[in-house]
């Protein structure tokens, strides 16, 4: 959507992680990191952000995929740390990062386009105690939930043109019932 960016890799090392993030904060208004934000032995992003003085706005959202997402600020800079699993990271990018990017360059329609569509035949959605973003395909005015919803499976996104949002603890949703659909950017 017309924004430039730089990709940089960092090893599982706290000092190197901190230096890379510090440099990114000097050069950019919005910094997006992927991986290293959970609670594993080699997840140093949260520690580095804390040491750099990034103020946490939120961390860990009750959703699937993408629970270990972080958003914070440092002065006038915005920092996102997205999960390391590819599909979880992409889902969070669509739902959280894109609105901030769009807002930063003055767009009024910052969120993904939202529709209410019936669930396709043969589909039903089970409730979870946390919100869900399900990769989906809109076909003939209905939305079909795709197989392969694992947060590590990026290939399903290649087939999807939407995400279905399901609130935490929602009732069972059966075929034909209306669901909230977020159109993915094309």
Q: What residues fall within each predicted segment?
A:
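Short catalytic-site patches enriched in acidic/histidine residues
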Residues: 11-21, 39-60
């Amino acid at each position: 959507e017309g924004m430039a960016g730089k990709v940089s890799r960092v090893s599982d090392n706290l000092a190197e992680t901190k230096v890379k993030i510090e440099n990114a904060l000097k050069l950019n208004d919005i910094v997006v990191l992927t991986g290293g934000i959970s609670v594993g032995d080699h997840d140093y992003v949260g520690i580095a952000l804390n040491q750099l003085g990034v103020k946490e706005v939120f961390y860990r959202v009750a959703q699937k995929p993408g629970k270990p997402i972080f958003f914070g600020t440092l002065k006038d800079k915005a920092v996102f740390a997205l999960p390391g699993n590819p599909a979880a990271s992409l889902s969070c990018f669509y739902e959280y990062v894109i609105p901030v990017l769009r807002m930063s360059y003055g767009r009024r329609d910052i969120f993904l386009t939202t529709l209410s569509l019936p669930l396709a035949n043969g589909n039903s959605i089970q409730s979870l105690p946390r919100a869900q973003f399900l990769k989906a395909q809109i076909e003939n005015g209905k939305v079909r939930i795709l197989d392969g919803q694992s947060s590590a499976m990026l290939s399903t996104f290649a087939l999807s043109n939407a995400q279905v949002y399901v609130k935490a603890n929602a009732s069972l949703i059966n075929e034909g019932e209306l669901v909230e659909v977020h159109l993915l950017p094309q």
